[in-house]
Every structure is written in structure tokens, then in C-alpha cells.
Amino acid sequence: RPLAEVDLVERTRYYRSAGGDALGERFFDAAIAALRSVERMPGIGSPRAGELCDIPGLRVRRVDRFPCGWYYFILADHLDVVRLLADPQDIAAMLDHED
């Protein structure tokens, strides 16, 4: 989804602004690695966020060394990657805003 791409760009800019180019690059690389792991093994993400928010099927794959994660659904023929959200964000509200 487009917002997931926007989230990646915005989070990368945030880390670059907060800690310089090297931190921005480390975040981007870690975020892409987490996303690729989901593409290879969709079940790797935790269903806990979906359970807590009462959103059936929602899974999250954490980004190593950063306080955020990819939120997605496993569909019959593809992955629906919804958002890349930072930990303190209200997940349910952000997903409602997407629709």
C-alpha cells in the first residue's frame, strides 16, 4: 500500500535527521531486511498486535534494532503490507485512517 512506502521514506528521513546519514542508512537497510524476511516467510510476523487491536489476521514484523515494525496481512495470493509504524503510535487508529 502507498502509506507503507510513505512510512518507510518518512522514518528513514527521521533517522537521518536525528543521527546522520549513517543512521538513516542503517534504518533503511534493517527495514528492508525485515520486509524481505516477511516476503520469504509470511508467518514470521507476530499476530499479537492484531489480537490486541481486535483486527483479525493483522501481523507485525519488528525491524531489528529500531522501535518500529511492518504491519501486514497474509492473503491467499499476496501479502498486504499496510504500514511501517513506530511503537508508540496508535495502531488501530492508523489502520482505520488507511481505509
Explain the meaning of each model-derived region:
Residues 1-30:
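Arg/Lys-rich, positively charged N-terminal/basic patches that mediate binding to nucleic acids
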Residues 63-99:
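Enriched for short, Lys/Arg-rich terminal
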Residues 36-63:
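A short, surface-exposed loop/turn module that caps and links secondary-structure elements
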Residues 13, 20, 36, 40-44, ...:
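Generic structural signal for secondary-structure transition and capping sites
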Residues 11, 41, 94-97:
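Residue-level signal for well-ordered alpha-helical positions
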Residues 24, 46-50, 93:
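Short, hydrophobic secondary-structure boundary micro-motifs
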Residues 26, 31-40:
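Generic amphipathic, hydrophobic interface segment in small proteins and small subunits
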